[in-house]
Amino acid sequence: MLTLRSYVGDRWVEGGGTPQTLLNPATEDPLATASSEGVDLAAALDHARARGGPALRALSFAERGAMLGTIAKAIQAHRDELLDLAVANGGNTRSDAKFDVEGAVATLSAYAELGAALGAARYLTDGEGLQLGRSPRFHGQHVGVPRTGVAVHVNAFNFPAWGFAEKAATALLAGMPVVSKPATSSAMVAHRIMQIVVEAKILPEGALSLLVGNARELPALLGAQDVLAFTGSGDTGARLRALPNVIRESVRVNVEADSLNAAVLGPDVEQGSDMYELFLKDVQRDITQKAGQKCTAIRRVVVPAAIAGAVRDDLVELLGAVRVGNPARDDVRMGPLATATQLADARAGVERLAAEGRLAFGSAAPLAAAGVDAGKGYFISPVLVAFEAGAAATAVHDREVFGPVASLLPYSGDAAEAVAIVARGNGGLVSSLYSDDGDWLQDAVFGIAPHHGRIFLGHPKIELSPGPGTVLPQLVHGGPGRAGGGEELGGPRGLAFYMQRVALEGARPVIGKLLGPQPG
């Protein structure tokens, strides 16, 4: 059985004590062990600050971006191996595994291109320079400079490749060294990516470290120049924000947490139309892709009451065609949940929703999955819960069931009512709207906008749209309230978290000489 090791201080270190065992969630067979016991976390952080930070800050954006491009190519060269690991350790179908691994490559490549566009500069100018007085020589310019600490990334179990890449790409391009902590249950993919990067000798010493096993006191060791980016539950995010050192040192923290994402069908959309079929396709995909274990997955399906029955029947038909089982089989469309804990949480969540609504498809009951021994694996069927009144429901607006579970909520067709229902989620990463009615869209978009980081406007004429569940590196990822209040990616916007914005005030020629030529 494989032993995963941490990569800290530019060497591989095996943890001691009693390790955690990583399983195949479809068969429950043990695959690997991981432990962080005995790893000197303070020394790992100091090494990143002392060696990785100065080396990265000495490079231009173009040079940093070139390294990201090389990492993307290295991962792509090992694509099939990584897909196999994602199937075995993550319970992903091959299609789901591609969604993760190819998403990592695409994000790294996007930030490599951004680095090339930013060119020879090492600092990021923020807006145009300002004349501060009667004389044009009295000048001001806002500038982003890399922070001199270390970026600690605590990633979720559901996207071990993309989660690693999307955080590391922005930090490294900004000029900050990274210590990446993958979720232990699915860490084999991130561990192998780290091996690939180390073997290829792409990055300067100290620029990238990996900690496997328990994070232990890692967040408690951060100081004023460090940053912490966390993806996971809202409860854990709140505990991290409340750490004494985080409060005392004003450690910069980004949290991407729970989200009750909604998909709203406009009153103008007729059953059988192209828009209607797109809506069904997006909802069905978000319920079943990665067994619903996506932070961006549609959880609340809000439809006009007049066609709620038809939508329910059509979704039931689509979900009934989904074969659940061992994702190593070609005929399986949906694999298991990642861990026994996730399965228990999902079952409890389904039971809570079903206590208020009605199970239209699936249940929390044990499932006979294809290609696995009876009683093995962390499987649950796709679940659709139908509610009689969208606005009156409570649990559906309060509890995210992190699995292949969605709730169907009727509304009158009025945009204001749809906005009120969606807003009950108390902040989300993304919600989607499907309508050709411009007036309805105007009210709906700007009604739900304050509650979201992204709004997806579904339309059948958008070719190759990946749907609302896909996070694109060019657009921000995050959201207010329940979603954590954070923001990642968004092209150059993603660099701001890792940089200090400083206002330079003085003689224009002096400031111009300090900054040098800037990208146009």
Question: How should each PLM-predicted stretch be described?
Answer:
Residues 1-136, 321, 338, 347:
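N-terminal Rossmann-like NAD(P)+-binding subdomain of aldehyde/semialdehyde dehydrogenases
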Residues 199-201, 225-227, 235-392, 414-420, ...:
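ALDH superfamily catalytic-core signature
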Residues 25, 41, 61, 272-276, ...:
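Residues at or immediately preceding the N-termini of alpha-helices
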Residues 26-33, 202-205, 224-227, 306, ...:
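Conserved C-terminal structural/oligomerization subdomain of aldehyde/semialdehyde dehydrogenase
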Residues 30-37, 53-57, 132, 152-153, ...:
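Short, well-ordered beta-strand elements within core beta-sheets of diverse protein domains
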Residues 28, 64, 86, 175, ...:
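Residue-level signal for inorganic ion chemistry
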Residues 120-278, 309, 412, 486:
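Rossmann-like NAD(P) dinucleotide-binding subdomain of oxidoreductase/dehydrogenase enzymes
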Residues 108, 190-193, 221, 240, ...:
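Hydrophobic packing residues within well-ordered alpha-helices of enzyme cores
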